[in-house]
Design a protein with these regions (language model features):
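Glycine/serine-rich phosphate-binding loop and adjoining beta1-alpha1 elements at the start
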Residues: 52, 56-135, 201, 209, ...
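Residue-level detector of alpha-helix initiation sites
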Residues: 84, 149-150, 174, 288-290, ...
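FAD-site-proximal beta/loop scaffold in flavoenzymes
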Residues: 248-278, 364-438
Length: 462
């Protein structure tokens, strides 16, 4: 009989007043007993609606049933038959909008905690198993993957399992893409990403770092080197700004730069060549998951006051509820229904305040959310010494500008056939944020998986 508890088994977490001063992982993971108890809540539905909500097609009821039986390694094998990065997706996937959003248990009560169970299985395997993935027999065909982020790594893993000789070209000095530069340690430990990459290398995937495709090598040169197909998963790392006065002041960062300096470069250390500013009061403009990450990092780096400035209200926030909840627990101050007008500097060109105007919500706009309308005469100054802009990113134009025949849309995103993920160049495929603009890790993984299947079909005919 299923466990008919209406609520999930709670996830153990660090105390908010402790964790907001360190970069250790907030969520501490299920014990074996917790995992089995939570897994027993699954009804093993005949129609399996949860699977339809998973972009990488994990056979969810099957692996959950194995967890309930205490057969954790078997559960892991089921997960990794379709998901190359379970320890990552189990931590950062917005399950509430994907598999858990379709869980029947969520109709009356809380859905089964599929993400926590996936994470548990991956962590259990890392801790208890010395077994390495076995490299399949090569089929002799070479495929290049541009970008070692979630879409590129997923595509590489799926192709390697089919016997392709896969080389991943990564612009940074370490593999992981947004997983290492964008997502903080307290949400996704870098050791986890490193281990998942090593698992792919065991399958035969070669990773070459410090390789900026479009500068060091072009897409055409990759074809000349013998690669039969190319997947572009170069992400969307070009930050957007509001275009308001004062964005050139010292102390204004894009969230992309702030998080990269913090997560990847550890620029908060005193001996770093270009240290990040030691802030006392920080305003983060925007309210997506990236904004939450930036705000929570600023708090951990010693800022006394950290504000999230957003022109709409709590109900319109696109960030995951869990991330908003954690941010509020950690003392982040939400300044909703406020919009920046300009950033004010002192005589040394450093940020001293941000001028904002109060907003009110009108009728819904094209996004379906109520349109924010400025309240005339309500301007005020928010005293801050650092401003972090987190209002979106777009793909870097380097690859498209050096690759003839590669079409993009008006946002600079690569145009692909949505069924095959093939671009307007034969043999060139793309997925993830390079195609969609900034989106979720799991959607990028799904695109990488879809592209791998299409590349396999393409090369099987050629």
């Amino acid at each position: 009989m299923p466990n008919m508890s209406l609520t999930k088994v709670p996830m153990p977490e660090q105390d908010p007043n402790v964790r907001n001063k360190n970069f250790l992982e907030v969520a501490m993971g299920y014990t074996e007993e917790m995992a089995m108890e939570e897994a027993s809540r699954c009804l093993n539905c005949k129609n399996k609606p949860c699977v339809s909500g998973c972009p990488v097609n994990v056979r969810i009821p099957e692996f959950v049933a194995k967890v309930a039986e205490g057969k954790f390694e078997e559960a892991y094998e089921i997960i990794t038959s379709t998901n190359s990065l379970p320890a990552i997706s189990g931590r950062v996937c917005p399950q509430e909008n994907q598999c858990e959003g379709k869980c029947v248990r969520g109709i009356k009560g809380e859905s089964v905690s599929i993400g926590r169970l996936e994470r548990f299985c991956a962590d259990y395997h890392m801790k208890h198993s010395d077994a390495k993935a076995v490299k399949p027999q090569s089929n002799g065909k070479k495929v290049a993957v541009v970008g070692a982020g979630p879409s590129g790594l997923t595509c590489a893993g799926d192709l390697a399992k089919k016997g392709y000789e896969v080389t991943v070209f990564e612009a940074f000095h370490t593999a992981g893409g947004v997983l290492v530069y964008g997502i903080p340690e307290f949400r996704l430990p870098k050791a986890i990403v490193k281990k998942e990459v090593e698992n792919l290398q065991d399958l035969g995937v070669e990773v070459k770092t410090n390789m900026v495709i479009g500068r060091v090598l072009s897409v055409d040169e990759l074809f000349e080197m013998g690669y039969k197909a190319i997947f572009i998963g170069s992400g969307a790392g070009l930050p957007s700004f509001m275009g308001i006065e004062g964005e050139d002041l010292i102390g204004v960062y894009s969230a992309n730069e702030y998080l990269t300096r913090t997560n990847l470069m550890k620029a908060y250390l005193d001996d770093y060549d270009t240290p990040i500013i030691k802030s006392k009061s920080v305003a983060v403009v925007g309210v997506g998951n990236v904004a939450m990450d930036a705000a929570r990092c600023a708090k951990r780096l010693g800022a006394e006051n950290v504000y999230i400035v957003y022109r709409r209200g709590m109900e319109e926030m696109p960030a995951r509820k869990e991330e908003v909840h954690h941010a509020m627990e950690e003392g982040i101050i939400f300044k909703n229904l406020n919009n920046p007008v300009k950033i004010l500097g002192d005589e040394n060109g450093r940020v001293r305040a941000m001028e904002c105007i109060e907003m009110e919500l009108g009728e819904p706009d094209a996004s379906g959310r109520r349109k924010p309308i400025a309240k005339e005469g309500s301007n005020f100054e928010l005293p801050v010494d650092t401003v972090i802009m987190s209002i979106g990113t777009s793909p870097n134009p380097l690859i498209r500008s050096t690759t003839p025949g590669l079409d993009t849309n008006k946002r600079g995103c690569l145009v692909v056939n949505e069924d095959t993920m093939q671009t307007t160049r034969e043999g060139v495929y793309a997925g993830g944020d390079a195609v969609t603009g900034a989106a979720t890790v799991i959607l990028a993984m799904g695109a990488g998986k879809q592209a791998a299947q299409s590349i396999d079909e393409y090369l099987s005919k050629n």
